[in-house]
Amino acid sequence: MLGQFIGSQKLPYKNVAVQLSKSCFGLTLIKSKRITPISTSRYEKHYSTTSVKYAIESELDSLVHSRNSNTIIKQSDVLPENIWRNYLKNNEIDKFTLHLLASLRGDDDFVKNLFKSGDLTYNELSIFINRIYKSNGHDIKRVIQNHHSLSYTELIYEIFELYTSTIPKESGIIKLNALHLKDLNLFITIFIKEAQLSKAQNVLQYIIDAEGSIEKITDHDTMVNFLRLRCGGLPKFWLVPQASYAVTKQTKKNSRLSSNSPNTRFPSSYKSTVPNTVLFEVINMILNKKVWKSKHSGILDSTIVYSLAHTFQKQMMDGFIKEHWGISSHGDPLDLFIKKKKVASAPSNEILIAIMSSYIYKDRNIDGAMKILDKFIRMYPDISLDNMFWRRLIQWCNRLWDPKIDRQGTFGYGCWNMMKNWNGAGTGKDVVLPYDFQIYEEFYRLFKRTNNGKIAAEIVSNVLIPHLSEKNVAVKKAELNLLNKYQTLAMNWLIERRQFKKAAFFIEEWSIDRNNRIQLREAFKKRKQLMLRKLSTRDKKSQSQKKRQDRYDEMEEEDMIIGRLW
């Protein structure tokens, strides 16, 4: 497959004949003589045994023979004038990637020559990296999924090495401009998404080495990634203590907030790797240096809060929040704060999530976080709480909920009522609950365990069916499964209360399509029959007990009569 992709394009191989072959993509490479692989770079030492360059070479070697090996054609007859721009124009990121990496096999200076000739510009290479990032590498993963010798993250690491080879040096010193920093931080983000933190650390270290030290860095994205990778500022990788009921032989006492998502990858370990003194110096620099005053953002401030929470710097975290937003975990909000600070806008949703999560993580309970959130809402009435906020809140509630201590799920239901009130409940207006798959997936665990079919029916009728029935919405299988879970919970709840007519009406009224209706009807019949058998068995037992009791009463009465006769 790799050969098919790159074989139809103009490759700068030495001593390679290109021959036409019938395949789904056109041409296939035919190897005629040995090709010397390029030399390894200073970063390749970490992956020398499984280098992607050798994997690509091996893959090409297995595809060198063609069915039509006698048909030789000229490269100029089939290749576009500028294949690289053609790839970008057609958004063929997979072909661009594999062609680029394969081209390096025969020419170490291939990319530099592309820039010299004008066939490719630095901006176009940056566009290529941005498109990999935005697409999450789906096209590349699809191409290499059947080739166990090729790894997506190692392919990306090869592109990183290639990219750094194009960065100019002055007197042997690397000079990074704004575009370089932007692209390099995209590499870091890609590796973080794939949970390849060692590769992300290598890219970050490359930037730090080029700049001299972390104290000399004034780039926003680089500082955010430094806090994430070396100061614990990545909450999705935090280990969260599980409630006792959730711990089984298959699960651990600690889990991660996003561990329910099948698409989320996790590193084997995650922790702060720098002394607290370094973290304090970095935060002090961000707060006090003039160059940073215009670079504050929700992402940067929230990452600082996460880092302080992960390193258990409670006092400094409280001080940072108080300095920025006038809210203290002790005492009332600072009433004069807004008057004193002319610019005191409400914190972003991202910051509120960070503050909430950090207090819960630090305290190992919900109380402190709820109290400080209440203070924020009172001081900043125009605060906006989006789906991500509610998702994170119910995730925390579920992780820390222990039904042995709290059978009613107090905090979980508190979260549910808070979300309803925030969206109009109690104001006389129609309640429009937000739709978010993960929110209701988390709530389902609460309602299922507490057997709350009433709220399940409310969610089906007010949230799930209205959203999934929209014409422009493409319904996913996971969403249909979640809908079926809520429908089944509501239906079974009605059946348990012997409200068979209401359960049947619910099915007819709130099924999304014919298949869903048939499925629910079958489940209804089975559940009803099971319920009737239980009732019948219960009645028989009751009648049997009544008969035994009657016989016992008769025997007692006879004994009393005989006793009087004697």
UniProtKB/Swiss-Prot annotation:
Quaternary structure (record): Binds to the 5'UTR of the OLI1 mRNA.
Residue ranges, annotated region (Disordered): 536-555
Main subcellular location: mitochondrion
GO annotation, biological process: regulation of translation
Organism, as annotated: Vanderwaltozyma polyspora (strain ATCC 22028 / DSM 70294 / BCRC 21397 / CBS 2163 / NBRC 10782 / NRRL Y-8283 / UCD 57-17)
Disulfide bond entries: none
NADP keyword on record: no
This protein's GO CC annotations: mitochondrion
Organelle transit peptide: 1-35
Name of the gene encoding the protein in the UniProt record: AEP2
Keywords annotated in UniProt: Mitochondrion, RNA-binding, Transit peptide, Translation regulation
Record-level Gene Ontology MF annotations: RNA binding
Function of the protein: Required for translation of the mitochondrial OLI1 transcript coding for the mitochondrial ATP synthase subunit 9.
Transmembrane listed as a keyword: no
Cellular compartment(s): Mitochondrion
Membership in a protein family: Belongs to the AEP2 family.
Protein name in the entry: ATPase expression protein 2, mitochondrial
